Amino acid sequence: TRKQITILLNGTAHGPALHVLLYIPNHVKRPAVFVGLNFWGNETINADPGIFLPTAYTEATTGYSMNTGPCLDGHRATDRCRGMAHGKWPLDMILKRGYAVATVFRSEVDPDYIGSFKDSVKAYYPELQNRPDNFSTIGAWAWSLSRVLDYLETDHDVDASRVAVFGWSRLGKAALWAAATDAVAEAHRQYRRDL
């Protein structure tokens, strides 16, 4: 089962939002959930045409065994981006083994390019900007993982007491930070393991 959930971070449709893509195996009741951010958009982890295309800035890259340039239109996702990162997301294996998967596109939180402050959730919290403990891009990503965990606690189709946050590269650092600051999260340092 696929769900797409919009989390309104300030309670209004005009404020910042996270678009959570949640896959739940049909053969398990209330499965544990793997939660992680993705680099290039929810639509890239699976070719499913029903996944909403993001409107957030999408990085054009030729690194990480990816070439997102041809699928983008001015740093915005198109249908050509669908399934591009499916090899990095073993959805079928995870679902078959009875686990759920939730992900959010990291650029909806903070696109992390020079001058991206205005497109980041950080812009909605100006009172934090001059403090020594102001949150960085990785901190913002970790914060968003905690918001996904908050949502999962309200979803009766999954077991929010059994959650593992994951990520690789800088998104792995965000997962570790979320695990360190959120009592529900449990860090996992590899994204692929024998489940």
Locations of the language-model features?
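Structural recognition of the beta-strand scaffold that forms the well-ordered cores
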Residues: 33-36, 101-105, 164-166, 187-190
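Extracellular/periplasmic catalytic domains that process cell-envelope and extracellular macromolecules
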Residues: 13-15, 27-30, 94-96, 158, ...
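Non-catalytic accessory segments flanking enzyme active sites
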Residues: 1-26
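Residues that flank catalytic or metal-binding motifs in active/ligand-binding sites
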Residues: 3, 16-18, 31, 90, ...
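Cap/lid segment of the alpha/beta-hydrolase catalytic domain
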Residues: 37-154, 160, 194-195
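Primarily recognizes the serine-hydrolase "nucleophile elbow" in alpha/beta-hydrolase
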Residues: 41, 147-195
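Short beta-strand element of the alpha/beta-hydrolase
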Residues: 19-22, 30-39
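Short amphipathic alpha-helices and their capping/turn segments at secondary-structure boundaries
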Residues: 21-27, 91, 177-182
